[in-house]
């Protein structure tokens, strides 16, 4: 019998779940390729460290952007190396793969994921709606008639969905997420400080001192960038309050999406959500104060999942390990 794996193919990180073993790998969705030979040099964390630092002969690719495949060849190569590292593929063995995708992905985007994963060395490829997997991984009773709302704030997209009786009732997807916050920080330094900083520096600022409320103080962080006035290297200090004001417009957009989803939700399910609250998953859920921020804006209880970064992958795993109704979700058309 073929092995069964779950794959959370994210814009920032890719996680792999192996049935009967759990999450066996989590690595950045980045691959470095030699332009002259077309061969890959490394992938994951080593490749991510090369972003913005390579000569013209090396391409560092982030093949998944805004939740979908941006470069088919690079994605296939990345997944191939990923599966080789986990020793899940061989000439005699190809695993069955269950892959999460945004609920609003187009037919073309879905086929691209299936093709890339199959070409990387899997046998059968099935697609699973990302918010549904996130809800299961967050511990929600998705088979219940009571409505639950899940907000998965990833790197490339924010998925908002209302779930009841094992399926998605209402959903929205927008391309304002973790990467948007990074760009907002870069733009803030460009416009307000006249300092150019890189993508990794912006991400580091978000992680180290980013907040979703101005009253939360996470201190300061030293930044090194390029002075746009004279082109020289400059060292500066950023505060958590500055980062908040830089990312606040993006946070408001995420709240607006949640509000629109609530407005489109049937009244009985809205009542359930008011009683049960909203669950946040994804890397964006780790931003200090975001649950309180969303709750204050919407007037609804909001909580962060126990393991927000792994919720989607854990959710696929729970479905794979289940012998009951939960397992049937894996085979639903989405």
Residue map of PLM features:
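Nucleotide/phosphate-binding catalytic cleft detector across ATP-hydrolyzing
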Residues: 1-155, 161-278, 285-334
């Amino acid at each position: 019998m073929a092995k069964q794996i779950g794959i959370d193919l994210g814009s920032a990180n890719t996680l792999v779940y192996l049935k009967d073993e759990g999450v066996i790998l989590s690595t950045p969705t980045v691959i470095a390729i030699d332009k002259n030979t077309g061969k890959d040099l490394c992938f994951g964390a080593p490749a991510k460290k090369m972003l913005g630092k390579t000569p013209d002969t090396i391409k560092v690719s982030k093949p998944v952007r805004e939740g979908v495949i941006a470069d088919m060849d690079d994605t296939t190569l990345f997944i191939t190396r990923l599966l080789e590292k986990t020793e899940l593929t061989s000439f005699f063995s190809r695993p069955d793969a269950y892959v999460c995708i945004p609920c609003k992905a187009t037919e073309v985007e879905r086929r691209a994921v299936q093709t890339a994963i199959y070409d990387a060395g899997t046998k059968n490829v099935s697609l699973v709606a990302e918010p549904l997997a996130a809800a299961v991984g967050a511990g929600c009773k998705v088979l219940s008639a009571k409505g639950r709302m899940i907000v998965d704030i990833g790197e490339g997209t924010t998925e908002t969905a209302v779930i009841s009786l094992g399926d998605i009732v209402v959903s929205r997807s927008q391309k304002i997420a973790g990467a948007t916050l990074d760009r907002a920080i870069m733009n803030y330094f460009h416009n307000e400080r006249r300092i150019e900083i890189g993508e990794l520096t912006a991400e580091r600022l978000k992680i180290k001192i980013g907040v979703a409320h101005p009253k939360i103080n996470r201190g300061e962080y030293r930044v090194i960038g390029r002075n746009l006035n004279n082109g020289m290297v400059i060292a500066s200090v950023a505060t958590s309050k500055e980062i908040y004001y830089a990312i606040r417009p993006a946070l408001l957009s995420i709240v607006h999406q949640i509000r629109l989803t609530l407005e489109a939700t049937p009244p009985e399910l809205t009542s359930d959500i008011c009683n049960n609250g909203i669950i946040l998953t994804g890397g964006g859920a780790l931003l200090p104060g975001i649950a309180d921020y969303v709750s204050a804006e919407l007037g609804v209880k909001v909580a962060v999942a126990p393991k927000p970064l792994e919720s989607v992958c854990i959710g696929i795993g729970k479905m794979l390990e289940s012998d009951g109704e939960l397992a049937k979700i894996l085979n639903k058309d989405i």
